[in-house]
From Swiss-Prot:
Matches recorded under PANTHER family: RIBOSOMAL PROTEIN S15, BACTERIAL AND ORGANELLAR, SMALL RIBOSOMAL SUBUNIT PROTEIN US15M
Name used for this protein in its record: Small ribosomal subunit protein uS15c
Similarity field: Belongs to the universal ribosomal protein uS15 family.
Keyword Ribosomal protein belongs to the record: yes
SMART domains in UniProt: Ribosomal_S15
UniProt xrefs under Pfam families: Ribosomal_S15 (PF00312)
Organism the protein comes from: Chloranthus spicatus
Length: 89
């Protein structure tokens, strides 16, 4: 599972406030909600919650990519997350 591969990214100390840990938790919640919504397609409240969690994770990933691009690339590689499309004006 993803949890085992993530242990190498974050040391064993208490890092519950780190961006990587928060993105990891949001990713686990997203995967659980996605599997739930495959069974319960009309659960609109869960769909709304999923969209909120996706937005929070997207904002955290944008912050991490601005602050430390190397850690960002490692994290999306470890968690198997697609890199979001960037808007160009």
């Amino acid at each position: 599972m993803v949890k085992n591969s993530f242990n190498s990214v974050i040391p064993q100390e208490e890092n519950k406030g780190s961006v990587e840990f928060q993105v990891f938790n949001f990713t686990n919640k997203i995967r659980r909600l996605t599997s739930h919504l495959e069974l319960h397609r009309k659960d609109y409240l869960s769909q709304r919650g999923l969209r909120g969690i996706l937005g929070k994770r997207q904002r955290l990933l944008a912050y991490l990519s601005k602050k430390n691009r190397v850690r960002y690339q490692e994290l999306i590689g470890q968690l198997d997350i697609r890199e979001p499309k960037t808007r160009e004006f």
